[in-house]
Design a protein with these regions (language model features):
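Non-heme di-metal
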Residues: 2-324
Length: 324
């Protein structure tokens, strides 16, 4: 929708408080649209409860976990742990966005609705992992305690526009990660569960993406700078997970989430929707940010080409060894 600017003067006048107020109507419209298309679903319906067995501890018939019990592939197990631990930090994410967006009006209603929907993801993933014995339950809990005990601080907590820009890309990145994890898991039950979660993440992305588009109509220079900063410095919210760098490298090789996927399936779709390189009428700082964004995307694509070549060479070596 087109927003009438309140003509507050220079970009410096656009404080977070004024932007929140100016975008309130957009948030309300997007919230109403979201509620019409979002479908409620029951996490327990996606869990293979009949596969469950007691673990050792308080039950005499408890059976210790063993890697061979899992139907999930190795890369699927790695990605599932990273994805679940990322979802587990929901209390910190809620605190971040509630503090920034507020708890009143349409903003507050969205914050609480988003939190409630996201809460399903951690519930169903943990139930699936434990019931199907896909992961070591003791290590999973140790990872959860370690990760959540560190807390979470968003890189973009200083700015409402940066935060909106970040979640527009991050929600899509999370959707893609869940979807690809399902494809690589080797278990149709897991794939179906993660497809359901990915549907939620996509709707969340659409909400923030549309909000970001509206922000461009109000404060194009500031929004362009925010998008530039977020894209150039992007990192997933689970970056603080113990062993994240090694897991991320394995997920890249396993084609769950890597540089090519990040460029083609996450950054480009949002930037194309915003027609980011076609926006004109920008001031000097906005133009500079737009140019730097274009240069960064070109550089990222070139790096992705190198990654693709290395990955193809690795696959060829592995195929040769398998055929030997």
């Amino acid at each position: 929708m087109t927003i009438a600017s309140p003509h507050l003067g220079s970009p410096a006048v656009w404080t977070d408080a004024r932007l929140l107020h100016a975008l309130e109507e957009v948030v309300e419209n997007e919230l109403n649209r979201h509620l019409k298309v979002a479908k409620d679903w029951m996490p327990h319906e996606y869990v293979p409860w009949s596969d469950g067995r007691n673990f050792p501890g308080l039950f005499e018939d408890g059976e210790a976990w063993d890697k061979e019990q899992s139907k999930v592939t190795e890369i699927g197990r790695i990605a599932l742990i990273v994805n679940l631990l990322t979802e587990d930090n929901l209390p910190s994410y809620h605190h971040e966005i509630a503090s920034l967006f507020g708890r009143d009006g349409a903003w507050g209603t969205w914050v609480h609705r988003w939190t409630a929907e996201e809460g399903r993801h951690g519930i169903v993933m943990r139930d699936y992992l434990l019931t199907s014995r896909a992961v070591d339950p003791d290590k999973l809990e140790q990872f959860r305690m370690s990760h959540m005990s560190e807390g979470f601080e968003s890189d973009n907590r200083h700015s409402m526009l940066h935060s909106v820009a970040y979640v527009a890309f991050q929600e899509l990145a999370t959707r893609i990660s869940h979807r690809n994890t399902g494809h690589q898991s080797g278990d149709p039950v897991c794939d179906r569960m993660l497809a359901r979660i990915a549907t939620d993440e996509n709707l969340h992305m659409i909400f923030y993406r549309n909000l970001l588009k509206a922000a461009f109509e109000l404060a194009p220079d500031l929004t362009m700078q925010a998008v530039r900063d977020v894209v150039v410095n992007f990192r997933m919210p689970g970056h603080g997970i113990p062993g994240f760098e090694r897991a991320a490298a394995q997920m890249a090789i396993g084609e769950v989430y890597n540089m090519r996927i990040h460029h083609d399936d996450v950054l480009q779709p949002v930037l194309r929707f915003l027609k980011i390189m076609e926006i004109d009428g920008l001031g000097p700082e906005g133009q500079k940010a737009q140019e730097e964004l274009g240069l960064y995307m070109g550089g990222l694509d070139a790096e992705a080409v190198k990654f693709d070549e290395k990955l193809a060479a690795r696959k060829a070596r592995m195929a040769a060894r398998a055929g030997a």
